């Protein structure tokens, strides 16, 4: 039998050099590591990794070729109280594997044991890693590098975005290929999108609990192989990587960036009762934050938390991010529960992973977006990330909903959020673009559901409606659910228009949830993470609706307003913004705090947003000049207005002079 040569300790993973494959694996506490390779008949062949350089185990298998299936058995102590859970009866996934063969099904054999080890061998049913070789012609691909001030983000799910699209070939709907189809690209261009932000595409697993209920993890925030593409989104698992890169190349040619939602905060191994796939059996003590009793710190709500202050885990995370940039040409990342990235265990701006990203010539040049919280004490860190990061601005989301959906909110608070939440983000040299403004996201109500439901309706998730937030700041306008009288439909439409206008014409970086521009509803489900069905798949029959045109017109209007695209903080007297009351006078201190919800926002001295968020028709005296409404607010008869605009109840209009 072929023997392993010692090989090299870097890079991590399995790498083919034309003559054989070099295998490397980190484990600081292992006593022995076996490489297990499987032939075409499924027969297992085991080799001890002969090289041991520091905490890196390595070996070189001559004559091995791409397509070889492999895994690891890692020997070491079973000492749960100390955080060690080695079990060589279990075949483990290489954390740096580029492709996985097999499914992560709920099976007792895929568990290591809780207090006592389960020594039943699982190689027959465990997923295997696959050695891949990387040859791809990027042609003249170049990143668009859209300036932050001009960036419009569109958050979408790979499958849900195109699975029901009637103009995309049936055989590629819901796949990576569909993202690069001309129909999809033309739609994004016409809408005005500059960056497509994809929910997780790294391989993930469905939680055993969901599988037992006949459900699946749809969103993908349960990662199992961070270097491997999720194969279900590919036309063929063997060509997934090229399909994905083809889509990115096509999007880049159209000037559209691709941002990946990435999950570095936890793994699909969940809590101690969860499955054993990889990290827990390779070096549980190093990869995870471990409590004094040997259990996990659950700062993510998912059962475990990756220890991103450990040097080896920092190297692993950094290598993963570089892989997606260098191999797939992605343009940035949105980091799920990103406060975990800064835990040491307390949150620090100079945490090891932040420092590694800052010092990396590759990662420091791409767009970085944080979901700036986790669920642990001290986990809410909005505004506290290092200067390279932009952050989801939940202050904006809540203020916009409260202002327009009949909750109390002073004008001053609304204006502060409209002005990129400078009280939160104007520090450490950060620019207004650091505020990622959103009204909705994958997590929560869709925009249509915000105006149709007062309460969540998550019964389909199998948790008796306990899951999902109860703090929605929504308003059903008098009737719970979709449909209703013409008057009800019109009032809901007006609220949607107001929320979209606030999102797309405010300072900061706007993020639009895919489907909001044509009224997608999840029927009140505000936590549809396990709904891989028509509840979450976008219905494109409404894509030519007036709402889509309204949204596109707003985006194109935004691009014409210097105060919004120059990405500079607004200062008193700089001509970027003036805040006026209904009489076109500067607001008094009392009006800012106690005045009616009536406001005029003059941008770049030429564009005026006139707002009447009260329940009464109100005369709004415009500033001096000849004003006319501009699309999408201009009607067929669009007379010049020189004095007064009749502001409808709960309405707004944008003018230009």
Curated annotation (Swiss-Prot):
Location of the active site: 336, 371
Entries under CDD domains matching the protein: AmyAc_Glg_debranch, E_set_GDE_Isoamylase_N
Annotated region described as Disordered, given as residue ranges: 458-479
Keywords (A to Z) from UniProt: Carbohydrate metabolism, Glycogen metabolism, Glycosidase, Hydrolase
Domain of life: Bacteria
GO biological process: DNA damage response; glycogen catabolic process
Catalytic reaction equation(s): Hydrolysis of (1->6)-alpha-D-glucosidic linkages to branches with degrees of polymerization of three or four glucose residues in limit dextrin
Activity regulation summary: Inhibited by iodoacetate, p-chloromercuribenzoate, HgCl(2), cupric sulfate and ammonium sulfate.
pH and activity: Optimum pH is 5.6 to 6.4.
Cytoplasm listed as a keyword: no
Disruption phenotype: Disruption of the gene leads to overproduction of glycogen containing short external chains.
One Gene Ontology MF term: glycogen debranching enzyme activity
Pathway: Glycan degradation; glycogen degradation
Site feature location: Transition state stabilizer: 443
Record note on quaternary structure: Monomer.
Job description of the protein: Removes maltotriose and maltotetraose chains that are attached by 1,6-alpha-linkage to the limit dextrin main chain, generating a debranched limit dextrin. Shows only very little activity with native glycogen.
PANTHER family (alphabetical): GLYCOGEN DEBRANCHING ENZYME
The protein's name in its UniProt record: Glycogen debranching enzyme
Protein's organism: Escherichia coli (strain K12)
